[in-house]
UniProtKB/Swiss-Prot annotation:
UniProt keyword terms in alphabetical order: Cobalamin biosynthesis, Methyltransferase, S-adenosyl-L-methionine, Transferase
Protein name: Cobalt-precorrin-5B C(1)-methyltransferase
Highest taxon, organism lineage: Bacteria
Pfam family, one: CbiD
PANTHER family associated with the record: COBALT-PRECORRIN-5B C(1)-METHYLTRANSFERASE
MF terms in GO: cobalt-precorrin-5B C1-methyltransferase activity
A GO biological process held by the record: methylation
InterPro entries xref list: CbiD (IPR002748), CbiD_sf (IPR036074)
Length: 365
């Protein structure tokens, strides 16, 4: 077991290692065994983080001209669909040089805009370099080797990853920029958002941001079919910056009033631990509109923005328009006027109802 820990939220959490580290270790081990004609049980690799890993080799398979073996992915205490997967590498002797291929269960890139060219196996640049470096460190100078990375359960597990959204088919991606998995990593989630924005920007001049699956469902149930939706979680500001970096000038944000109201107060990370001003935004607008303090207090006494909307009923379209206009103003300020923004605000979960749509929105035209 990988014995490296970090502190997060007062808890001690165990780190893990990436699919890229697993692939590099398996490739190095298979190459070593192929040319040295002997089995080994542990292999050491370096990582871009300058942390050495000693990983246990599994499932050694010897054939006439090749050897394959696996490393089990250990995600530590991170919630990771690939944790526990066997990542295999097959080493075959060739006349000269080094070749890297993707086999069964390693995804194939089908769209432009990712870090790997269209049609190539989804082995990201850093893992590619790691694999090459580790293999060449044990490859005899007068020999050549072809490495094939494969993941027997890759197709199955890929359905639980971002790959289907990114146009990566038939398997998982071999990932990792540091070689180490840090539990509950905010950076890992933000990087996945950055990648999706980059990929969706290739064939689209505009993007639609949603906070989660409910926002996407809201659009699909109303017949929206374009492939320009990006799930941004709570990272509104970060996602805007990524879109601007890709030259995107038209952005629509679709969200529940509980999320969008936070932007009206200038909160660009909408996680409840960072900002929770949903009821305060509604209460302030009611006060500014001249409603009595008894109603304002009833709103503040609600547990959720959903409860506040249901309490108020159907007679407050001007309230949602005022909140929506403040959201648009905040977005414009954040982007320094460099993008055109629209918003769609809804409430509900099973049956979602539109509360406000900005005047220039044309998603359903």
């Amino acid at each position: 077991m990988f014995d490296m820990y970090i502190e997060s939220g007062g808890k001690k959490l165990r780190c893990g290692y990436t699919t890229g580290s697993c692939a590099a270790a398996a490739a190095k081990a298979a190459t070593y065994m192929l040319f040295n004609k002997k089995d080994i049980s542990v292999i050491e690799i370096d990582t871009p983080k300058n942390i050495k890993l000693n990983l246990e080799i599994q499932d050694i398979q010897v054939e006439k001209n090749s050897i394959s073996c696996s490393i089990v992915k250990d995600g530590g205490d991170d919630i990771d669909a690939t944790s526990g997967l066997e990542i295999f590498a097959k080493a075959e002797e060739i006349e000269e040089g080094f070749e890297l291929c993707g086999g069964e269960g390693v995804g194939v890139v089908t769209k432009e805009g990712l870090f790997v060219e269209k049609g190539q196996p989804a082995i990201n640049p850093v893992p590619r370099e790691m694999i090459k470096k580790e293999v060449l460190s044990v490859l005899p100078k007068d020999k050549g080797v072809r490495i094939t990375i494969f993941v027997p359960r890759g197709r199955e597990i890929a359905k639980k990853t971002f790959n289907p959204r990114l146009g990566i088919v038939n398997g998982i991606s071999i990932l990792g920029t540091t070689g180490i998995v840090y539990p509950m990593s905010e950076e890992a989630l933000k990087e996945s958002i950055r990648i999706e924005i980059r990929q969706k920007s290739v064939n689209n001049k505009d993007l639609v941001f949603v906070f989660g699956n409910m926002g996407e469902r809201f659009l699909r149930e109303r017949g929206y079919k374009k492939d320009n939706i990006v799930v941004i979680s709570n990272y509104v500001g970060f996602s805007i910056e990524c879109a601007l970096a890709q030259g995107i000038k038209d952005l629509t944000i679709v969200g529940h009033i509980g999320k969008l109201s936070k932007i009206a107060f200038g909160c660009f990370n909408t996680h409840s631990r960072v900002s929770d001003v949903r009821l305060e935004v509604i209460a302030l607008e009611l006060t500014l509109m001249g409603y009595d303090l008894e109603l304002v207090q009833k709103v503040l006494d609600q547990k959720t923005s959903e409860g506040a909307v249901r309490l108020l009923g159907d007679d407050f379209p001007m309230l949602y328009e005022r909140i929506g206009e403040k959201v648009l103003k905040r977005l414009d300020i954040y982007a320094y006027g460099e993008a055109n923004f629209n918003i769609l605000m809804y409430y509900g979960s099973k049956e979602m109802k539109l509360l406000y749509e900005s005047k220039n929105s044309n998603l359903f035209d």
